[in-house]
Structures are given as C-alpha cells and as structure tokens.
Amino acid sequence: MSVSKKPMVLVILDGYGYREEQQDNAIFSAKTPVMDALWANRPHTLIDASGLEVGLPDRQMGNSEVGHVNLGAGRIVYQDLTRLDVEIKDRVFFANPVLTGAVDKAKSAGKAVHIMGLLSAGGVHSHEDHIMAMVELAAERGAEKIYLHAFLDGRDTPPRSAESSLKKFEEKFAALGKGRVASIIGRYYAMDRDNRWDRVEKAYDLLTLAQGEFQADTAVAGLQAAYARDENDEFVKATVIRAEGQPDAAMEDGDALIFMNFRADRAREITRAFVNADFDGFARKKVVNVDFVMLTEYAADIKTAVAYPPASLVNTFGEWMAKNDKTQLRISETEKYAHVTFFFNGGVEESFKGEDRILINSPKVATYDLQPEMSSAELTEKLVAAIKSGKYDTIICNYPNGDMVGHTGVMEAAVKAVEALDHCVDEVAKAVESVGGQLLITADHGNAEQMRDPATGQAHTAHTNLPVPLIYVGDKNVKAVEGGKLSDIAPTMLSLMGMEIPQEMTGKPLFIVE
C-alpha cells in the first residue's frame, strides 16, 4: 500500500476580508475564538485581493472569478479591462492587426466602419474609453464613414447617466469632421443573454436596416425623448439618429462591424445573429455579410475575427501538480464549485490527471440569510475525511458563506455565517495537524467585513477592496513576508511542499522556512 500523504490544504473563506473598523463588520462582531487564536499564535500576514494587484483597475474591488484565477495561476492575470487600458495608453491598441485590418479593408473598398458596444464608464461589460479609442483608430486610418451604435447602460451606472457619454462622442465626431452616432438603444434589447430573441431582433433591425421605433436628429435629443417617455438608459427603445440630409447608416455587405464589449455573456446573442449562417433565433429581415470583429472571444464556436484572443495560462498550480504526478482534490458547495475548478485551473474545464472533485449541494433557499451556515457542516465532514484519507498531496477548498451571506446585506445572518465558519476551520485545522499536513487559510476578496455603506447608510451588499488574511498552520517553522497578493499563494504552497516553482509563476512565497 502507498504511503499516506500529508496534504497541503488551501482553505479559501470567500468574502472574508480584513477591516480594522468594528462598525458594521460582521467578522469582528461574530464570536470567532478559533480564527482569533490562529491569528494571535500562528504565522500570518495580510494580502491584496483587489485592484492592480489582481489585474483589475486601480482600487477596483476584487471578485471571486478574478480571485481564483490569480490564486491558481501564481502570477497576476490581467483582466480584459485592464489589459485594454494599458494597451490604449501605450498605443499598442492602435496597431492591433485585427482592428486595423478590418478598418483598412473597409476604407479601401469605400465601405463603412460600424462600431457598436455598451457606451458606459461602468467597466463591467465595456468601457467608453475603449470605444473612443476605436473611433480614433478608425479616423486615424482614414475611414470616412464611421458609425457608432450606442447601447445604453443604466445597470452598471446610474439609471439616467448616458447623456454626458453621448455628448462626449458627438463632440468628438464634430472635432474629427467625420463620423456620427447612428443609433441608440438600451442594453435590455441589444445585450440579452436569456434567448429573448424578440428583444435582440429590435436591436438587429436598428443596426442592419437603420429602422427603429423612434428617430432623432442627435443622440442627446433621442435620449431626452426617451426620458420623456419614461425610459431609463437600460430600456431606451430603438432610436435611429439621423438629421435631415444625412445618409442612413444601414449596414451593407463589406462594411466592418467592430463589437467593443469585452465581456462575453451579454455579447453572444447579437453576435450570433450577425455571424451564424444557420441562425434561427428570429427571421432576419436582412442578412448582411459584414466583416465582424469581436473585441474578445465571446464563445469558441462563434467563427469570426477576434481582436484579443484569450491568453492561455501555462503551468497553473493544478497543471503543475499533474505534471509532477501529484494528487489533488477540489471541493466546495455549488455556489463556488466552478471557482475551485474551472477558474482556479485558469479557465480549463477538464480536470487534470490526478485531480478529484467533490461537489456539495448548496441549500435550496431563496436567499442565504435564511440559512447562513449553508452546507458548511457537510462540506467540512467531506473535507476532513479527504485530509485523513492519505490520498491527496494537496486539497483546495472554498467556503462560500462570507460572500453569499454578505451579499444579502443582512448583518445578523452574516455574523451567523462567520460563526459557522469558525467551527469549520477548527475541525479542518485539527484534521490537518493530526496527519502532519499543512494548511493555508485565506480569502479571494472581502465582503462580510463591511455590511453597511457609510456614505448612504444603506446595506453594503457588494465586495470590498480591502486586504484578506493569510494564516499558516503546520509544523514548519516559517516567517511571514509582508506585501503579498493572491498570485503569491500558489508559489507559497509549492515552496512549503518543497517543490520547484515553474518559471511562469512570477508570484513569490509568503512564508519562508527558517
């Protein structure tokens, strides 16, 4: 029989941030004798889980997807928003071969360049600065017919905030002496993700036929008319923007169409309507053969040009374990199962050689404040059994409670969630020590430590940009290093396991064996 393994265990307490202030802090308010004792008596440090340190814009709050990608990659993984910001600033964007190729081809054929996307400073699906850069790119390369089709936000931005953005673009086109805003429509229609094709059809007709329910001379006038109809940005009905004497902006074969959203989920449906020959979501009144460019890859099965293809991550923690013939377990509840598998593996769906997975069903309740402990007892039972099984070199576990209950904004429930976690950590730490293993306890981002927004007095249901704890439990004599971040965790684990760190991992070990 094989020798019993002493596992390196990583426990991710989702949404468990560190905040000095005690007011509205569910983690401080909860009775947590176990975490308090570990923090007092074990090697520990605070690490960054937001902003530039995880590849997000400066000071932007972290999230679970980004957090787990960084945790597993062992390097800062730049998110699309940040990558584009950097490339535009460095002018690399303006030489992107896919974007320049599409513009140059349309220009030389005397065709139009259509640019569409969510005109928003929200930074969730797109950013208006990127759209502005695309307008500049088209103009710099000599395109004469530049048409902007603006999808309006009001979800990731205030409900009526599009006017300043539209003004900015109308002023830009006036300064360039060419191009114009050709249409406006709310994201409710253009960016559906639930196969509500009747909505998408209205956006498609507006774009391809230059036909809508309403028409206005300018984008701002069109928006003001929508507000007068009591439509907020998100729900603005299809509006053609065309002043007297202007040619219409209906799409023609051979035109270029650049879709400037970087997030995939709400970009897929309208893209398929343009790109798929066998599209059957609705009967297209006009099938137009445009040179369609996706800013990022919206789906692997959409066959059209991509300006920024996905960067594949080589030698993530999971892949490196497999290459070194190590066994690993990923375990969580439904809510965070994808995070400890797909995201931790750098966007790879299939498990690696030697990788087992355990999924514990999250409770079927309307909102998790009704059951703040969630399925933590069953998760802990399975995790402890795996630790003691001697089967695994490493185990990655996520407890969702701090985040999922934090999102409800209910302080009492968040306190109960944190107290439930304390019992779980106790059992896990004891199990790890009983088999001579090692344990790292951390979080992917903050949430439960800030349950009220001091500015508004309302419940704070979002993530925070605060640091998260990192604690070592084990028999090695280690010293903590300050100034760490999530991408230092994988190298830390490898170093504690006595393994080589692959060169692709640029993170540094945060616990040095003395």
UniProtKB/Swiss-Prot annotation:
Pathway field of the UniProt record reads: Carbohydrate degradation; glycolysis; pyruvate from D-glyceraldehyde 3-phosphate: step 3/5
Instruction: Indicate the secretion signal residues.
Output: none
Q: What domain of life?
A: Bacteria
Entries under InterPro entries matching the protein: Alkaline_phosphatase_core_sf, BPG-indep_PGM_N, Metalloenzyme, PGAM_B_sf, Pgm_bpd_ind
What are the annotated GO cellular component locations? cytosol
MF terms (GO), sorted A to Z? manganese ion binding; phosphoglycerate mutase activity
Q: What keywords are assigned to this protein?
A: Glycolysis, Isomerase, Manganese, Metal-binding
| The reaction(s) this protein catalyses | (2R)-2-phosphoglycerate = (2R)-3-phosphoglycerate
Q: Where does Mn(2+) 2 bind?
A: D14, S64, D444, H445
For the protein in the UniProt heading, the enzyme class is: isomerase
GO biological process terms held by the UniProt record: glucose catabolic process; glycolytic process
The active-site annotation reads S64
**Could you say which cofactors this protein requires?**
Mn(2+)
Q: Which residues bind Mn(2+) 1?
A: D403, H407, H463
Enzyme Commission no: 5.4.2.12
For this chain's record, the cofactor binding note is: Binds 2 manganese ions per subunit.
Task: Please tell me where substrate binds in this chain.
Answer: H125, R155, D156, R187, R193, R263, A264, D265, R266, K336
Role: Catalyzes the interconversion of 2-phosphoglycerate and 3-phosphoglycerate.
Subunit and partners: Monomer.
| UniProt record similarity statement | Belongs to the BPG-independent phosphoglycerate mutase family.
Q: What is this protein called?
A: 2,3-bisphosphoglycerate-independent phosphoglycerate mutase
